[in-house]
């Protein structure tokens, strides 16, 4: 639960701008994924950590939708925060992560994009499973 706190998210984004931190994290993530069948989430997983992964999903949503989701999540935890500050935080983090020199956030050319702004979690899972089955059948 603590990993989803505002402070942890912001701290991770700031620390991720440091090259030596990014390189060590990539090394550790790659070690965890040596055996196939791993599912990882992160802003550079498909481009830097596992550029040769067989199946990549690039999830996206508008900053406003992501801010609303984050705002509701933080409010449910009792964290005093405004929607406006949450939206500003989402935009700042996106800017920092897309412009950092080491492992910037970008979509892998072979990733399948899903804009989940107006899609339920159940619909996202069904879509992902359908795409996975389609791709794995093509690779057999």
What are these regions (language model features)?
Residues 3, 9, 71-77, 96, ...:
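NTP-dependent small-molecule kinase module
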Residues 52, 59-67:
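Conserved RecA-like helicase motor core of SF1/SF2 enzymes
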Residues 14, 49, 55:
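Active-site segments that bind and position negatively charged phosphate/pyrophosphate groups
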Residues 38, 54-58, 111-113:
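Short, well-ordered beta-strand core segments
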Residues 44-46, 63-64, 119:
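Short glycine-rich anion-binding loops that position phosphate/pyrophosphate groups of nucleotides
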Residues 1-37, 64, 68, 83-101, ...:
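ATP-dependent small-molecule kinase phosphotransfer cores
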Residues 30-33, 48-51, 79, 104-107:
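Conserved catalytic network of the ASCE P-loop NTPase/AAA+ motor domain
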């Amino acid at each position: 639960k603590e990993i989803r706190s505002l402070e942890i998210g912001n701290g991770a984004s700031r620390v991720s701008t440091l090259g030596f931190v990014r390189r060590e994290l990539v090394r550790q993530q790659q070690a965890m994924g040596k055996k196939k069948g791993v599912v990882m989430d992160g802003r550079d997983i498909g481009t830097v950590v596992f550029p040769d992964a067989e199946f990549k999903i690039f999830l996206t949503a508008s900053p406003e939708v992501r801010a609303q989701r984050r705002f509701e999540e933080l409010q449910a935890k009792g964290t005093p925060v405004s929607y406006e500050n949450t939206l500003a935080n989402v935009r700042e983090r996106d800017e920092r992560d897309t412009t950092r020199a080491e492992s910037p956030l970008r979509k892998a050319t072979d990733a399948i994009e899903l804009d989940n702004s107006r899609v339920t979690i159940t619909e996202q899972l069904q879509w992902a499973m359908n795409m996975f089955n389609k791709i794995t059948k093509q690779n057999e």
